[in-house]
Every structure is written in structure tokens, then in C-alpha cells.
A protein has these predicted regions:
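Auxiliary tRNA-acceptor-end handling modules of aminoacyl-tRNA synthetases
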Residues: 27-81, 86-337, 346, 355, ...
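N-terminal secretory signal peptides that target proteins for export/translocation
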Residues: 1-8
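Bacterial N-terminal signal peptides
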Residues: 10-23
Length: 369
């Protein structure tokens, strides 16, 4: 009894001490762990990755490349070729021609042929520079208003387009384009091949290349070796048909009828600063002419207009009875002409000077090799 009471009195002070301790803990606020300032602030937004398709600075793209200054400067590094389009030449017409330097050698597909000529211009559209053939078949010779209406009524043609290869030049503001767009069938030569062989020859860009370039103040030239191929030559029918069946006629002048090369020479030439006075054609005289439809007036019975194709000869001394021209008519004797024939060819060219002397021009025609 005494032992049990002693135990009770011993426990009671302990319970009171525990109660007071719990009350004190309740009155003391719970400590909150300190948060570092760097962790408290919101994380910075991640920087978006660079666009891999974004154009690089001009200088970075043409680093170590060699340049030929001209109407359109040409940059070349190994197999890469670029054309620099001056800002002033965007939407400015120039003469664009394509010549055939090498071809198959049969069925009318020969070297030294013309493949087309156009009045053209470059236009910047987004990240592409378009080479457009302007529509000169329909014009207006009477006024600006009708000329604008004619321009809106008839479409130009897209000859090709090149990707913008860099940012514009920081000082010149010019545009750099990849000249690889010229490794395509710009003059439509595949149609000539199909007409000759009735086979679907097409450009093989992977095996085509720009062989040579040349640039002058008024001219830029690029020479492209184009590979044309067709997948297969059709076999004749196993059993002869009862009647005649037209069959493709493969090339006979190539080692493999499925493959051939054609060389294009692209010429970009500046137009003269002052236009030449045109001369209308007279049907009573024989001339090579250039024709178009004049829609400037609706009162004409026949809107077709014919102009004579002629050389631009201007006297150095307009007051002289006979004067040399400012720029003579120049014929280049091709290196393919055999040496023993070149003298005769040159003499034949220069024989025309006798006719020009009668109209006041001396040495109007020159021959160069």
C-alpha cells in the first residue's frame, strides 16, 4: 500500500513536467528551413536552339573562294559556285542566252547551236532568287496605263530559281545565290532529245557540273556540262506484230545509248544604257525579224508589229563620210575549225566590209580567233 502510493506520487510530477514541456513546444513556432536565394528565383527560360537553315554571314560562306568580278560577280571554291546579285540588278532586265557548246553529233543535235534567248530578270522571293523570262510577246507602245494592263494580263515564265546562300552583303547589300540551279534543263533540251529518239531522257543533276566561269563588266558566263540519261532502252516485241509498230530509235553516236552529255553556255549580258532606234520591217525586203503584238490601241486592224534584227553600228566620227564604228561586228573563229580552213573562213567574214563601206563604215566587221 505504501509502495503503491509512493509510485503514484513519483509519476505525478513526471506527468506535470511532460505537460508543461508540450505546452512550451506548442507556444514556440516551428522553424522553417532557409531556402537559398538562387533556388527561390524562377529558372531562366532556355535559349531556343539556332535555326540550322538560317543563312550565314556573306563572308563566312565565301571564305577562301575566288571571285571573278563582272555584271554578276562569280564566286568559286572547289566544286561550289555562287552568283552575287547586286541590289541594283534585282528586277532589272538583262539579256539571257543559252548556247550549246557540245552535243550528241547526230539527228540535228550538234555543237555550236543556239538554245534560246530571253529578256530576263532576277526577283527575290523569300529565300529564293527567281530567274524569270519576261513576256515580250505582248506589249503596249502607246502609254504607261495600257502597258501596265498588258503586263498584268500575260504571265512571265520561270526559268529557274536558286536558294539564297547567305545574308546580304553588309555594305553592297547584294544577294548571294547557289549557282547550282543552272544544273537543270533551263532551255528544255530534253524535248529535242525526245523528238529525236522518242525516249524519256532527263537531266541527271548528280553527274552534271559547272565546268567554267567567266565574268566581265557587261557579261557573266557559266558553262555547265549536263548529263542526260534514260533508265532503259525498250526491247522490241517478242512476237512481231501483224502491222508496223513504231519503236524508239536510240542514239547511235554514243557508246551507251542510255547516257549522253550536252554542254550549256549560260550568258548574262547587260542591256545598253541607251536603247537603239528600232527599224520596222518592210515585207518587200528580206530581213530576219522579231515580232510581237501591240495591244496599246484597239483601233488597229492588225496589232502585229515586225522589227528588223540588226547590228548596232555607230560611227566614231559622225561627221566623217567614212568612219570606223564605235563597236564593230565581231565574229569569233571557233577553235574547232581546222587550222588550214581558218584563213578562208576569216577572208569570207571580212568580205562583208565592202558592203558596209558603201554606207559609210570602215572595218565594220572584224574576225578574231
Amino acid at each position: 500500500m505504501l509502495q503503491r502510493g509512493f509510485t503514484r506520487f513519483q509519476i505525478l510530477p513526471s506527468l506535470i513536467a511532460l505537460a508543461l514541456s508540450a505546452h512550451a513546444m506548442a507556444q514556440t513556432p516551428t522553424a522553417v528551413p532557409a531556402v537559398p536565394a538562387s533556388a527561390a528565383s524562377a529558372p531562366a527560360a532556355a535559349k531556343p536552339p539556332a535555326d540550322p537553315t538560317a543563312p550565314k554571314p556573306f563572308a563566312d560562306v565565301i571564305k577562301d573562294a575566288k571571285v571573278e568580278d563582272g555584271l554578276f560577280p562569280i564566286w568559286r571554291k572547289d566544286e561550289k559556285v555562287w552568283m552575287e546579285i547586286p541590289k541594283a540588278m534585282l528586277k532589272k532586265p538583262f539579256l539571257f542566252t543559252v548556247n550549246i557548246a557540245n552535243s550528241v553529233g547526230e539527228r540535228g543535235l550538234y555543237a555550236s547551236q543556239m538554245a534560246g534567248d530571253w529578256m530576263a530578270e532576277f526577283r527575290l522571293v523569300g529565300k529564293q532568287v527567281q530567274l524569270l523570262a519576261l513576256n515580250t510577246k505582248f506589249r503596249s507602245l502607246s502609254g504607261e496605263g495600257s502597258a501596265r494592263a498588258v503586263e498584268q494580263a500575260f504571265s512571265p515564265s520561270l526559268l529557274g530559281s536558286g536558294a539564297v546562300a547567305s545574308l546580304e552583303h553588309p555594305e553592297r547589300k547584294s544577294v548571294l545565290i547557289d549557282a547550282g540551279f543552272l544544273l537543270s534543263d533551263v532551255p528544255g533540251y530534253s524535248t529535242r532529245l525526245e523528238r529525236a529518239y522518242r525516249l524519256p531522257f532527263a537531266v541527271d543533276k548528280a553527274n552534271s557540273s559547272i565546268e567554267a566561269t567567266r565574268a566581265e563588266p557587261a557579261l557573266s558566263t557559266l558553262t555547265a556540262r549536263m548529263h542526260f540519261s534514260t533508265p532503259r532502252i525498250p526491247a522490241p516485241p517478242l512476237v512481231p506484230p501483224p502491222g508496223p509498230v513504231p519503236m524508239p530509235t536510240p542514239p547511235q553516236a554514243t557508246p551507251d545509248a542510255r547516257s549522253l552529255f550536252v554542254t550549256y553556255v549560260y550568258n548574262f549580258a547587260a542591256l545598253p544604257s541607251a536603247a537603239m532606234e528600232p527599224r520596222r520591217a518592210d515585207p518587200r525586203l528580206g530581213h530576219f525579224t522579231r515580232s510581237f503584238t501591240d495591244l496599246g490601241s484597239d483601233l488597229k486592224a492588225n496589232p502585229r508589229v515586225h522589227f528588223v534584227n540588226r547590228w548596232r553600228l555607230e560611227k566614231k566620227d559622225p561627221a566623217a563620210e567614212i568612219s570606223e564604228p564605235i563597236k564593230p561586228i565581231t565574229y569569233w573563229i571557233d577553235k574547232n575549225i581546222p587550222v588550214n580552213y581558218r584563213g578562208a573562213v576569216e577572208a569570207g567574214i571580212l568580205e562583208w566590209n565592202k558592203a558596209f563601206e558603201k554606207i559609210g563604215f570602215k572595218n565594220a566587221v572584224v574576225a578574231k580567233q
